[in-house]
Amino acid sequence: MIEFKEFGVTFLGGGELNIDDLINAKKLAPKLIAADGAADLAIKNGFVPAAVIGDMDSVSNDFFVKHSQLIKLHETEQETTDFDKCLRNVDAKFGIGIGFLGARIDHELAALN
């Protein structure tokens, strides 16, 4: 369990991203948690996540070489989405999800459920 009880958390997924949405979410929820491959998306847009959670099947090896100090929570099971893994493994004051829609339909439907 990753604990950010005093903070709001922005969860970043690997779907469609409006950078202004991410900037605004981080103003409200400053701790950024990347769901798997969204770690690369965060770096590409100038953000370093506090942690990466997921099955790690989408994040680049280069990311972990350059950011080895970050919290990594590797869950290999394939029964749930990386967003679900984030929600189950972070204890925060509140959470905002960005980038969980518009990529894979199965993940999109799970995020809406």
Residues of each region from the PLM?
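Acidic/Gly/His-enriched mid-domain segments of enzyme catalytic cores or analogous surface patches
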Residues: L28, G37-N113
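Short beta-strand/loop segments at the ligand-binding rim of alpha/beta enzyme cores
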Residues: F7, A25-I33
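N-terminal nucleotide-binding beta1-loop-alpha1 segment
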Residues: M1-E16
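N-terminal active-site wall of soluble small-molecule enzyme domains
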Residues: G13-N24, A38-L41, N45
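Short secondary-structure boundary/capping segments within folded domains
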Residues: M1-E3, K31, K44
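Glycine-rich helix-loop-beta junction characteristic of Rossmann-like nucleotide cofactor-binding loops
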Residues: I2, I23-K26
